[in-house]
Each structure stands twice: as structure tokens, then as C-alpha cells.
Amino acid sequence: MLNLFRESDPIDIMGPDERNIEVLRYSSGADSTLGILSENGSMGREFLAYTLEDEFREEKVSAETRIPEGTYNVKLRTEGGFHNRYSQKFGVPWHKGMLHVQDVPGFEYILIHTGNTDENTAGCLLVADSSTQNITKNGFIGASVAAYKRLYSSLAQWIVDGNKLTITYIDYD
């Protein structure tokens, strides 16, 4: 069983207008990193989705490297190609902007979106409802659109309502 806590993990006390989701990275393959997206709620830690990102690299390679461990603000990005495609795909007013991970040193335009393999990431975080291992073959996550639609409504509305959303990346791999 995967232990989602380390002794050194801080327990954050969030204000009523603050929300933090966490990516627990648990497996690094040659081309991808698999994780679990979760959130602490009133009933304990809640599973939200599986995740897939690019692999860890000591030196960043553009669009081929996962972002560093840390906590970052998430805001809505209402411009760019992804925003335009998702506005058409999911429709307005449902789509309010891309979930955009902010102020990552050395990275820009880190989004949370749909996809299945490291070919779809370019450094971004993909979410899905299923996952296969990435040790003996390339990592794959499935039912990505279903997971994205389930998560997006709640997270985007939280931001639209003027609340603070953060995401914490934790390396267990």
C-alpha cells in the first residue's frame, strides 16, 4: 500500500478561502512520471485523479522536463492555443480558462489538461482516471477527459469565486 505521507510532510492549515491540491509523484520511468492527485478534506485525504508528467532531469530540457517539487499558485489562463481549443471543445461558459500553474522557476505556461502519454505533456500535468506502470514500458493514463471534466468544474469555479488555489508537487519517486 502506498503511504501518502512522510514524517517530514507539513500539515497545512488552510483558510476558508484557500484550497491546496497535491501531486504525489510515485514512479519515474525513462520518459514519464506517474503520480496521484489528491486533496485533504474533512474526511481525510481524497483521491482526485492519476497524473502523468515528463520525466525528472537534472538540467531542464524545454518541453521534456517535469517541474520542480514545490507549492505553486494556480490561476486561470484565458489566452493561447489550449484555451481556444478547450473553449471550442468544452464550450463557453463551462470552460473559463486553462488551469495554469504559476511562478515555476525556469518554466512557463504549465497547464493542467487532458492527455495520455508523455507526448502530450510538454512539461504540463495530465490528469486521468486510470494509470499503467512506466517501468517496463512508457507510462499511460486513460479516461483523461472524464477526469478533467470532473475536476475542472470545481477547481475553476473556486478560482472564479475569488478564492486561492495552490498545487503542491511532492517527490516520492
Model-found features: residue ranges?
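Cell wall/extracellular polymer interaction/catalysis modules
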Residues: L2-L165, I170-D173
